[in-house]
Amino acid sequence: MARKEIIDEITMKRAITRITYEIIERNKELDKLVLIGIKTRGVYLAKRIQERLQQLEGLEIPFGELDTRPFRDDKQAQEDTTEIDIDITGKDVILVDDVLYTGRTIRAAIDGIVKLGRPARVQLAVLVDRGHRELPIRADYVGKNIPTGHDEEIIVQMSEHDGNDSILIKRED
């Protein structure tokens, strides 16, 4: 299986900054925002967006971690390790994940969000949209669109979890 780096650390940082600016531009009431990262790498991405919002706007945006495993329809249900101590009712929730592929993780995330409260709206921010949707789900904020084949995989590496920042494509041989 061949792996190739397609996005380096600098380009990844720029994509996260661009997502942050787009969030600022499209949300008039930033004080109503709540960032929810989808475990695992979506959590680190959401924290980085939270830090950039703090730097750019001086706001401490509430943050939570969502475990979608209990809500998946294509995998065995597992223990819920969600960590959201925020009332999301009436808030503008931004779900954050590393890669958007079939849409099944996001559908599960929305189920998890609805279980916690009734947000005013839910938006989606992803670092990579690779296509191949099985459900009618579209990201509001996309760092990079990287079309892939079904025999390819996008691997997002984040320093908090993997020791470095990069995006790789892995092809089946």
UniProtKB/Swiss-Prot annotation:
Catalytic activity, EC: 2.4.2.9
Subunit composition and interactions: Homodimer and homohexamer; in equilibrium.
GO biological process, one term: DNA-templated transcription termination
Catalysed conversion reaction: UMP + diphosphate = 5-phospho-alpha-D-ribose 1-diphosphate + uracil
Upper taxonomic lineage: Bacteria, Bacillati, Bacillota, Bacilli, Lactobacillales
HAMAP family: PyrR
Gene3D superfamilies xrefs: 3.40.50.2020
InterPro entries the record matches: PRibTrfase_dom, PRTase-like, PyrR, PyrR_bifunctional
Keyword terms: Glycosyltransferase, RNA-binding, Transcription, Transcription regulation, Transcription termination, Transferase
Protein's name in the database: Bifunctional protein PyrR
GO molecular function, one term: RNA binding
Keyword Iron-sulfur included in the entry's annotation: no
Physiological role: Regulates transcriptional attenuation of the pyrimidine nucleotide (pyr) operon by binding in a uridine-dependent manner to specific sites on pyr mRNA. This disrupts an antiterminator hairpin in the RNA and favors formation of a downstream transcription terminator, leading to a reduced expression of downstream genes. Also displays a weak uracil phosphoribosyltransferase activity which is not physiologically significant.
Keyword Ubl conjugation on entry: no
Motif (PRPP-binding): 93-105
Family the UniProt entry places it in: Belongs to the purine/pyrimidine phosphoribosyltransferase family. PyrR subfamily.
